[in-house]
Every structure is written in structure tokens, then in C-alpha cells.
Amino acid sequence: MSLTLLPAVDVRDGKAVRLRQGESGSETDYGSPLEAARTWVESGAEWIHLVDLDAAFGTGNNRDQLRAIVKELGDKVNIEMSGGVRDDASLDAALEAGAARVNIGTAALENPDWTASVIKKYGDRVAVGLDVRGHTLAARGWVKEGGDLFETMKFLDSVGCSRYVVTDVARDGMMSGPNIELLREVASRTDAKVTASGGISKLDDLRNIKELAELGVDAAILGKSLYARAFTLEEALEVAR
């Protein structure tokens, strides 16, 4: 089975950045978000993972930049939007901007009834981001704790969640390899699909994730590994096929 790859474009203060372990203030600036997204599309990406970090941290938003990316590239690539989607207004804005799929994170922990209602309404256009430290969920902008991972999954499974985006916060942006055990554990406990995120640093990491395909891990988000040129997107896509 092939693995779908989603190059990430994380936007803070109008610029494409990468964080270390999701910490505000740890940014490395990579310039224009639109240029970054163009690069990944030209390199063969079928999906882009687009994150509004200011919205996630509650420090404003980059809605105009995100809309510009979707407007130019939305007919060439599927766009998954993430960051600060926690109510009807923010979800509707992302969907109206042209997102093929929207990730909700904090809201799934803070407002389960709302989360259940939007999963029911939008089906596989909504994924839930599970940002994990150990077996504990990290909530708003990765700052607060949000409860037990598997208790939360049990609820989300019961309301029909179709996809989890699983990030080991300790590994994100650290180039230290993905948490294969965590991915295996999550995937083996749910019928939902799983997107792997965080820590991917070499092509062998993608090969290891691909081995979890039969459990339902069918996608991976690539961030710092691409920006730091650990490998090219073309090389990664070749491995993922």
C-alpha cells in the first residue's frame, strides 16, 4: 500500500516557519508560505498540510495568507487546514476557503459535543489532531494538558471520527525519528485512518511508517525534514509509492 505524503506549511506572522517541539519562540523562518507551497506542488505533492500557528496559539491569524495559497493552488492540490479550528466560525472559514479537509485539535478536547456534531455533519472532511506526550494529550497550542489519549479516542471513535493526525510533541521538529510504537498503538485501537506526524528525519522513517499500512496508517506529514533538506520530496514520494 502506498503512503500519502503531506508537506507542511506552518504559518506564523505571515511567514513559513518550523517550530521545535511545537514551542512558541522556537521558530526557524523559511520565507513566503505561498512560495513554500508552490515548491511542494511543483515537486509532486498531492496534499499540503497548511497550519495557522497564530490561530493555534491564540495570537491572531494568517487567514489572508492561507486563502491566497488555496486560491492559487487549490485546483492543483488537496489542502488540509489546521490551527485554531475550534468553533463553527473557524471551521466554516476553513471549509469556505477551499480546504479539502480540516483538522480540529484543542476543540476536540474542550468541546466534545461540538466535535461530535461536526464529525457527524462533515464526515471525512474533518480529522482530529491528537498531539501526545506519553499517553497524555497536549491541548491549546501544545501548552496545556488535555487528558488521556485512549479515553479521548474511545469517545471520538464512538461518534464516528474517520481520521486521527497523531503527533508525538517531544519529537516534532527535532529530526529524531517518528514514534513508531505510539503510531502502532493508536492504529491498532481504532478503525479510523491515521496520519503520522512529527520526527520524520530520513527515508527509512517513511519505510517504517509504511509497514504500519495494514493497521490503517496511510499518510505522513513532512515538515522539518524537507525544509532542512534531509531528503527531497521527490525522493520521499518514490519511497511512499
UniProtKB/Swiss-Prot annotation:
EC number(s) on file: 5.3.1.16
GO molecular function: 1-(5-phosphoribosyl)-5-[(5-phosphoribosylamino)methylideneamino]imidazole-4-carboxamide isomerase activity; phosphoribosylanthranilate isomerase activity
Active site: 10 (proton acceptor), 131 (proton donor)
Pathway recorded for this protein: Amino-acid biosynthesis; L-histidine biosynthesis; L-histidine from 5-phospho-alpha-D-ribose 1-diphosphate: step 4/9
GO terms under biological process: L-histidine biosynthetic process; L-tryptophan biosynthetic process
InterPro entries: Aldolase_TIM (IPR013785), His_biosynth (IPR006062), HisA/PriA_Actinobacteria (IPR010188), Isoase_HisA-like (IPR044524), Isoase_HisA-like_bact (IPR023016), RibuloseP-bd_barrel (IPR011060)
Claim: Isomerase is one of the keywords in the record: yes
GO cellular component: cytoplasm
Catalytically driven reaction(s): 1-(5-phospho-beta-D-ribosyl)-5-[(5-phospho-beta-D-ribosylamino)methylideneamino]imidazole-4-carboxamide = 5-[(5-phospho-1-deoxy-D-ribulos-1-ylimino)methylamino]-1-(5-phospho-beta-D-ribosyl)imidazole-4-carboxamide
Keywords linked to the UniProt accession: Amino-acid biosynthesis, Cytoplasm, Histidine biosynthesis, Isomerase
Location(s), subcellular: Cytoplasm
Family, as annotated: Belongs to the HisA/HisF family.
HAMAP family: HisA
This protein's name: 1-(5-phosphoribosyl)-5-[(5-phosphoribosylamino)methylideneamino] imidazole-4-carboxamide isomerase
